[in-house]
């Protein structure tokens, strides 16, 4: 087993912790978390829609590390008249067709179900708080 193999589990445990923290918002329909599910490829988010008014299109990853380190360009579109609303909804529909909504944090695997080598690595990272550092780096 290679240490890098624990990375997807670290991502999943971070997502589970986030969803557990915000479970009330998920229950009330204030927060939707969708998991990408496609048999042939993964999805790497590169855009953001906000309130049918703003769209951010970028080559940059949408995470704090990328915003600190990456020097990629982005395009922020302000569309108060909703001229692009139809296009945005169509694209969102194509994306959501390949996702499933996460209703509860317990739908994600608990770290206790991970392979033993992964559990050891994640415990070691958490004990030394290196998981926090890794989250900043990744």
Predicted regions and their residues:
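PLD/PLD-like phosphodiesterase catalytic module centered on the HKD motif
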Residues: 1-138
């Amino acid at each position: 087993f290679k240490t890098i193999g624990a990375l997807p589990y670290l991502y999943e445990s971070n997502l589970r912790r986030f969803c557990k923290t915000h479970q009330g918002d998920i229950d009330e329909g204030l927060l939707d978390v969708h998991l990408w599910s496609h048999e042939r490829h993964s999805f790497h988010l590169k855009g953001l829609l906000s309130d049918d008014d703003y769209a951010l299109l970028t080559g940059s990853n949408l995470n704090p590390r990328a915003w600190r380190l990456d020097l990629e360009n982005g395009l922020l579109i302000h569309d108060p008249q909703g001229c692009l609303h139809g296009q945005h909804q169509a694209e969102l529909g194509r994306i959501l067709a390949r996702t499933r909504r996460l209703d509860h944090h317990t739908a994600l695997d608990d770290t206790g179900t991970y392979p033993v080598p992964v559990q050891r690595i994640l415990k070691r990272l958490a004990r030394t708080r290196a998981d926090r550092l890794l989250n900043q780096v990744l």
